[in-house]
């Protein structure tokens, strides 16, 4: 590690230590789904609109996406546009936040290289998120080095912008803990220079992690058990109807189990009091529905019909905004990506992000 790095980082941190900064983002491996929405996107929009933060950086993590998609870079490239559209559709405003593409900030790779010298292989192996992701992708026998080290890359992303806050889902807690360990190790060697981030979880406990519609523990694009934010209404309805429920609730009159039932987990995440007056006036609130289901006499299809109405009401404005933000097909802009990036200042934000990261590394 070059000796000058410490002094450059130290002077920069002293100037901006009081700033409140958010860093968060997503991998462009596909369109974003409702798990992303309730797990982090809604919280990002809320934080954006509070005015409590000096700067908010939202990163489309294309370089990180290549760690397990190296044989399909075109998939990553194409989905940069899809993720950007989903951001705009959910209400993220480029006038209030910096939406940028990770690969446009090469300083992040440099910082990640330095951090690799502060982390052991055994520590990465103990990271529960890394372990579960390796198992899910069947990487046990042959783990790509880039994928194995992605907690270090995430730490570089966070600390490069001196982020004080990272809105994320429950599954990202081990990643933030490891980032804090890197910060402590770096600061112990080079002085108090880096900022330790804090994770902000969704305010609604039901939103910490939505299960897949098949009842699996995690909604995942790779498992095909998602409801995408851009789904057409008829596709949402089909997926809701096919959702896993209590396997022992075979007849309407049978008592049903609410705990761990994906249909009720989704209702906890999406349902609001006004939905009952509009879609199910027979009940006053969700507790009444749960009680009826538990004592028997309420069928799964009725509950799913209500859930479909609730989700359609939530996703329809998102879908409409997405259509409005999407580039026109055909004509002079066949791929759409360049026009969208210009329109939403992704390139400008990328240069701004470069500047922030470059200042961290300029005196090396």
Functional labels for PLM-detected ranges:
Residues 19-156, 274, 310-315, 319-320:
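N-terminal Rossmann-like or analogous alpha/beta NTP/dinucleotide-binding catalytic cores
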Residues 32-41, 56-57, 62, 71-76, ...:
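Structured ligand/cofactor/substrate-binding pocket environments in proteins
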